[in-house]
Amino acid sequence: MKKIVFLYKILLVYFLINSNLFAEKISFFEEGKKLFEKKNFLESKILFEKDIVFNPLSEKSYLYLAKIFNFDSNDEEEEVNLNNVLLINPQNDEAIYMMIILKIKQSDYDESKKFIDNFNLVCNSFCSKKEEIRKKFNKIVPENEKSNN
């Protein structure tokens, strides 16, 4: 009988600990977002990475990491995180917009064009950026493409 009571106590403690860990997991993204808005990028980056550990399909955490790497001018890491967002949600127009800007910055005409075509199909909250994208894209259009249009 004592063993059964002891076993119940152990199970109770185990479930209490796990429920606290679960509650903590949920707040990683929200805390990271608050720190990001305060421009505390280093600490917010750590919290977004923790959120990804517990929730690998957290497209928002990947997106905020991409924004942090954009701010740090780390194009390689920004692209990795944007690709992760687009793998999780191919219609995330903010990620597509950021990828277009990155590809234009890298003077990658073909990829830029591909993302712009996709952006025109799925734009939702970033449709107002179409003119900005067009102007930036026209600066990298090759001469032979300009004559075809």
Task: Give the ranges of each region predicted by the language model.
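Alpha-helical segment of the N-proximal tetratricopeptide repeat
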Residues: 26-50, 54
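Register position in tetratricopeptide repeats
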Residues: 37-38, 71-72, 105, 139-143
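Canonical tetratricopeptide repeat
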Residues: 64, 98, 132-136
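TPR/TPR-like (Sel1-like) alpha-helical repeat modules
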Residues: 87-90, 100-128, 138
